[in-house]
Swiss-Prot record:
Residue stretches spanning the membrane: none
Family to which the UniProt record says this protein belongs: Belongs to the pseudomonas-type ThrB family.
Protein's name according to its UniProt entry: Amicoumacin kinase
Reactions that this protein is recorded to catalyse: amicoumacin A + ATP = amicoumacin A 2-phosphate + ADP + H(+)
GO BP terms, alphabetized: response to antibiotic; threonine biosynthetic process
Phenotype of the disrupted gene, per the record: Knockout mutant is susceptible to amicoumacin A.
Annotated keywords: Antibiotic resistance, Kinase, Transferase
Pfam families, per database record: APH
SUPFAM superfamilies registered for this protein in UniProt: Protein kinase-like (PK-like) (SSF56112)
Listed EC numbers: 2.7.1.230
Molecular function GO labels: homoserine kinase activity
Coiled-coil intervals, chain numbering: none
Length: 336
């Protein structure tokens, strides 16, 4: 999880910005509860006795137009019948409100409905959930095929424009083998075909911290990372996330991969057609995600002050990347 940018922390005057947010969205300043400061400052606020989620970031990190790309896609999904945490417009009818910081930049505010239900727990971690996740992801991919940008300025990034994949910017320059492996894999992936049936705007960070489970129904939130990608990479990212930190620990990674993917794809194929041959590329996309997380960890950590545990974790990632180690030993041809 990314920490709020240190340059943003320096200029964030919480009380001022929250007062402005309350005025622009019409909620009570006294009923604002701090939740988190990861990629955004996140608060819960009340309006008409309904809870909403307020997210605050800064133009250092995102432009207002870039966020409009998220808001517009969310509305497209909601109109198509997918349960998402929808944006709430401000009293001025805006999806993104800008509060000047006095230094030429702005704090950007947006408010969302609070997703019904709860985070999944151990009792929910079973084939029903995996199947419903498949249906949910398949529905998003099916709907994204009909999405049209209303304004080219709102366009989200392509898969290879991801900041954390710029490994040379964050990883020590002597890790030549890491860069070679990343370049080689990304060049290979760039040759994959792209069409409306396999590539489009996707969530790109689905995991059990980003949706609520309400009596068998999923509502996703946190669409901060949406971008253009192959549908199979969106599936791979979710798989990487459930392998990385499962709600219920597994003994055998390959066996769990088989269990998860079997039920997930059953649900997925009910909602979206995707040529099964694409599943054979999942191991490559899992390795790509491993590289992205390696970049993210270097972006987060100060290598001069990290402890032994973090050093060991980075060393493990480096070994995996340099040796091209598969993330899971499962043979994906079993699903095809």
């Amino acid at each position: 999880m990314l920490d709020v940018h240190k340059d943003i922390k320096k200029i964030f005057h919480e009380e001022q910005v929250l007062a402005e947010a309350a005025a622009r969205y019409g909620f009570s300043k006294d009923q604002v509860r701090f939740l988190a400061d990861a990629e955004n400052y996140v608060y819960e606020c009340m309006k008409d006795n309904q809870p909403y989620i307020l997210k605050i970031t800064h133009t250092i990190r995102r432009s207002s137009d870039y966020m409009m790309g998220e808001m517009e896609w969310l509305r497209h999904l909601a109109i198509g019948g997918i349960s998402v945490a929808k944006p709430l417009p401000s009293l001025n009818g805006k999806d993104v409100e800008a509060v000047p910081d006095g230094n030429g930049g702005s704090f950007l505010l947006r408010v969302y409905e609070k997703a019904p239900g709860q985070k999944v727990d151990e009792s929910d971690w079973n084939e029903t959930l995996f199947y419903e996740l498949g249906r949910y992801t398949g529905s998003m991919h099916s709907l994204t095929k009909s999405y049209k940008l209303s304004n080219p300025a709102f366009k989200r990034q392509e898969w290879d424009e991801e900041e954390q994949l710029k490994l040379r910017k964050y990883v020590p320059e002597d890790q030549i083998k890491v860069f070679q492996q990343a370049d080689s894999l990304m060049n290979e992936l760039r040759r994959l075909p792209k069409s409306q049936d396999n590539y489009g705007l996707v969530h790109a960070d689905l995991h059990h911290g980003n949706f609520n489970w309400d009596h068998g129904k999923i509502t996703a939130f946190d669409f901060d990372d949406i971008g253009y990608n192959w549908f199979v990479n969106d599936i791979s990212i979710l798989l990487y996330n459930v392998l990385w930190y499962p709600v219920v620990p597994y003994d055998d990674k390959a066996a769990f991969t088989e269990e998860f993917m079997t039920h997930f794809m059953k649900g997925y194929w009910e909602e979206n057609e995707l040529d099964p041959a694409w599943l054979m590329i999942i191991p490559d996309f899992l390795r790509l995600r491993h590289m992205l997380i390696y970049g993210l960890l270097h972006q987060m950590f100060d290598l001069n002050t990290i402890g032994e545990e973090e050093k060991e974790m980075l060393a493990g990632f480096r070994r995996d990347i340099e040796n091209g180690t598969p993330i899971t030993a499962f043979d994906f041809s079993a699903l095809v």
